[in-house]
Amino acid sequence: MSQPTLLDTPLYALLHKDDIRGFNRERPQNGPIDMVGGDFRGLDLRELNAAGIDFSDAYFRSADLRGIDFRQASLEGASLAHAQISGAYFPPELSADEILMSMNFGTRLRYRTR
């Protein structure tokens, strides 16, 4: 199993400094943002503009994800163990059961095909 990674990018550094407004201001407006395998454990990410971000294989243990709209983000393989997700939107490819399994047991999110 892969381990969470501290990514070496300016945008990732903003998130780790809890500067969500700075991240939203500095992020590219189009094109994907690579946060694959990133370590987001325990971070408060509320108000994050997650559109276009690839969070594949990321770790969100105990992170505050309340109110984030992940519908335009990739979360395949991410772990949500003990994360706060009230009011968050998830991609339609993720079932509620899949999200609950990840929250309760730390399993990796698996996308279902339509």
Protein language model annotation of sequence segments:
Residues M1-T5:
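Terminal non-domain segments
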Residues L7-R114:
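Tandem repeat scaffolds
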